Amino acid sequence: MRILGLDIGDRTIGIAISDPLGFTAQGITTIRRKSEAYDLEEIKKICDKYEVDTIVSGLPKNMNGTLGPQSEKVLEFCDLIKEHLNIEIKMWDERLTTVAATRAMLEADLSRSKRKKIVDKVAATYILQGYLDSLSK
């Protein structure tokens, strides 16, 4: 069984998957959001394909640790996922993951257009890898 990582935004959802042993995270795709039904179906397809038993979603907290409007949207969508897919969902503090992902892509000398296409997938990888690393401590 594998763990799925999500970076949920208003326009896209970055997706990452763990290896079967749960040691490493790999970005697999970015879903361009269309509707709740479409988004849930796309996530379900990925969960079925990889035999996912747990989902880790990034929770966008403010720098002082409080939850803002974007956090509420993410929590509501995660409740929908839980309802429709019956998969355990864990929340992971995603502060600065997009910043770290962008920095890594800049260091890799990726063009702006390439970075824009994959930043959410890379951020989902950072979220999931952080969670996986916490399990091994």
Swiss-Prot record:
- Superkingdom of the source species: Bacteria
Q: Does the keyword Cytoplasm apply?
A: yes
Top EC class of this enzyme: hydrolase
Q: Where is this protein localized, as stated in its record?
A: Cytoplasm
**Record InterPro entries:** RNaseH-like_sf, YqgF, YqgF/RNaseH-like_dom, YqgF/RNaseH-like_dom_sf
Name any one GO molecular function.
nuclease activity
Keywords carried by this UniProt record: Cytoplasm, Hydrolase, Nuclease, Ribosome biogenesis
Q: Which GO terms describe its biological process?
A: rRNA 5'-end processing
Its principal location? cytoplasm
Which PANTHER family is this protein grouped with?
A: POLYNUCLEOTIDYL TRANSFERASE, RIBONUCLEASE H-LIKE SUPERFAMILY PROTEIN
Function, as annotated: Could be a nuclease involved in processing of the 5'-end of pre-16S rRNA.
Q: Which family does it belong to?
A: Belongs to the YqgF nuclease family.
Q: What is this protein called?
A: Putative pre-16S rRNA nuclease
Q: Which organism is it from?
A: Clostridium botulinum (strain Hall / ATCC 3502 / NCTC 13319 / Type A)
